[in-house]
């Protein structure tokens, strides 16, 4: 509830696993049920639904084995009235293109070679909206059933004091009437650190004018007027703080293989967001091993995307420590976006994105830079993939959808909707709503505006591809060939002596 400021911990523990149940869906439903029946004043449940597409058919709440055969993984959560969160990815696979037509007079034992092509299985906007409609209905129905089923077990609501955060209306009025133009000018400072400095100067100026005012309360008042100004300008003037139109993309520059000793690299800059994306290739033994509760054994991850967000990228002197939750999430989203378009076939690829400066959409810069790094390493891809972050500002029945949002619009807006894909379809998406819900009509409009933005970015990336110069001196090559099994012992040698000598002498990796 609003004003509930008490530390609350929900603990979800897995005691038994059948290797077919979706733990992510079950965990959210269990957490929601625990909150709903508690003595906290919560009267709405939240649940999750997963959708898969198997052999062209939609399957709701698939088992894990069914999900492994799917070309779509869509995860939605919400209440009985509103959609709150979406995560989606397509899963690449092999498409059978053709096989040799056999002459009836040929040897019947002859086996014709089958020709396949790797495809991303990106899904189009219209098909995705149709799937949303079906899964959303199941989501709404399940929440209504949950609430009805758990109502009898709900504890009596406890009487607690809620912490009201009240603005000083006198300060808000004074700031609005006397310093609105100053705040509007400060919003033109696009970097987060520059905006903060400008707003701090305004605060100090007002304190000199009103010496008896509380500085913390004044800071809240200035923040409130700033948010009003940003949102009103977008809704009423249809112009953003940096002067862009609602669907306008910031200027983009792309440089590839800027690091001469890396296998490949890309410096991707969009506005004041810049990512240095570096790709390293390896063999099968370089894959990362991991285990899941629902797996039967150790798995190998041969495509990795890691995202690092140092403090200096936003002008903060913060210590460089372990990977944070946000960095894990952004890296995972970029991996989901790019993985469907590559068929590594025995190779291992690690992509690392170092954010050098950030003013919003750094995860989408990672996706764009990651694709360019793949091409700069001469790795075949089935599609050109770009990413764009969409936003929204809404007041009553009035709303505006924003393309390529910057940090200010993410902070003061109502939606953070990241969409990645080709010109034809979507490979991954992630949506978080601050409003408490979004209608399918608004979601559809955002998807199509994102498609236009992706097409613009992809055109720039395709042009940049033409200027790629490979780092031939350091770029590894992979050869696959067959040897007579009877010679394997000689190649390995006594206790591995021969194969080690070959590896050291020729600086190669050998996997038999």
Language model features: what each stretch is:
Residues 1-3, 72-77, 301-307, 330-344, ...:
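Structured alpha-helical segments in the cores of large, soluble enzyme domains
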Residues 1-8, 14-16, 20-21, 80, ...:
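Glycine-rich, flexible beta-strand/loop modules in the N-terminal catalytic cores of phosphate-handling
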Residues 2-4, 37-43, 284-286, 298, ...:
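Secondary-structure transition/capping motifs at alpha-helix termini
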Residues 2-8, 43-45, 142-160, 193-194, ...:
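Flexible, glycine/charged-enriched surface loops at secondary-structure junctions
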Residues 21-39, 256-279, 359-379, 489-499:
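Conserved phosphate/anionic-ligand binding catalytic regions in large, soluble enzymes, centered on
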Residues 41-187, 374-468:
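Mobile "lid/hinge" segments at catalytic clefts and subdomain interfaces of large enzymes
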Residues 45, 154-298, 476-490, 498:
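Extended amphipathic alpha-helical scaffolds
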Residues 505-512:
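Polar interaction faces of repeat-based domains
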């Amino acid at each position: 509830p609003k004003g509930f400021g008490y530390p609350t911990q929900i603990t979800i523990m897995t005691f038994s696993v059948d290797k077919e149940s979706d733990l992510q869906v079950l965990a959210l439903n269990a957490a929601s049920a625990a909150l709903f029946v508690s003595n906290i004043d919560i009267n709405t449940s939240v649940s999750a639904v997963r959708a898969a597409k198997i052999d062209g058919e939609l399957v709701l709440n698939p088992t894990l084995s069914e999900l492994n055969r799917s070309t779509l993984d869509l995860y939605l959560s919400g209440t009985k009235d509103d959609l709150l969160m979406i995560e989606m990815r397509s899963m690449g696979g092999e498409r059978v293109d053709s096989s040799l037509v056999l002459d009836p007079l040929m040897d019947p034992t002859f086996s014709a070679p089958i020709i396949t092509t790797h495809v991303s299985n990106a899904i189009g906007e219209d098909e995705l909206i149709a799937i949303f409609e079906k899964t959303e209905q199941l989501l709404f129905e399940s929440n209504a059933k949950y609430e009805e089923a758990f109502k009898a077990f709900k504890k009596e609501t406890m009487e607690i004091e809620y912490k009201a955060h009240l603005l000083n209306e006198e300060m808000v009025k004074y700031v609005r009437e006397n310093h609105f133009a100053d705040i509007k000018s400060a919003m033109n400072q696009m970097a987060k650190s520059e905006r903060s400095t400008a707003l701090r100067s305004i605060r100090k100026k007002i304190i000199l004018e009103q010496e008896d005012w509380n500085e913390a309360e004044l800071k809240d008042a200035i923040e409130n007027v700033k948010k009003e100004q940003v949102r009103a300008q977008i809704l009423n003037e249809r112009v953003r703080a940096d002067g862009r139109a609602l669907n306008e993309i910031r200027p983009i520059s792309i440089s590839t293989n800027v690091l001469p000793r890396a296998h490949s690299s890309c410096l991707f800059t969009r506005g004041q967001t810049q990512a240095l994306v570096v790709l390293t290739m390896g063999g099968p033994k370089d894959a990362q091993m991991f285990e899941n509760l629902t797996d039967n054994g150790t798995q190998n991850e041969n495509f990795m995307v890691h995202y690092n967000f140092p403090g200096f990228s936003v002008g903060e002197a913060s210590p460089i420590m372990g990977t944070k939750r946000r960095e894990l999430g952004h890296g995972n989203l970029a991996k989901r976006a790019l993985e469907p378009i590559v068929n590594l076939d025995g190779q291992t690829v690690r992509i690392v994105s170092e954010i050098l400066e950030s003013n919003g959409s750094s995860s989408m810069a990672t996706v764009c830079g990651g694709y360019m790094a793949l091409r700069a390493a001469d790795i075949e891809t089935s599609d050109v993939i770009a990413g764009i972050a969409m936003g929204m500002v809404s007041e009553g029945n009035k709303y505006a959808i924003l393309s390529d949002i910057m940090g200010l619009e993410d902070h003061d807006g109502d939606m953070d909707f990241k969409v990645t894909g080709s010109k034809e379809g979507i490979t991954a998406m992630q949506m978080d709503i601050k409003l408490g819900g979004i209608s399918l009509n608004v979601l559809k409009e955002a998807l199509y505006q994102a498609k236009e933005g992706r097409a613009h970015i992809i055109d720039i990336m395709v042009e940049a591809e033409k200027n790629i110069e490979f780092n031939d001196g350091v770029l590894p090559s992979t050869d696959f060939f067959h040897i007579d099994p009877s010679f394997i012992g000689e190649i390995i040698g006594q206790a591995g002596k021969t194969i080690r000598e070959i590896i050291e002498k020729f600086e190669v990796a050998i996997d038999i």
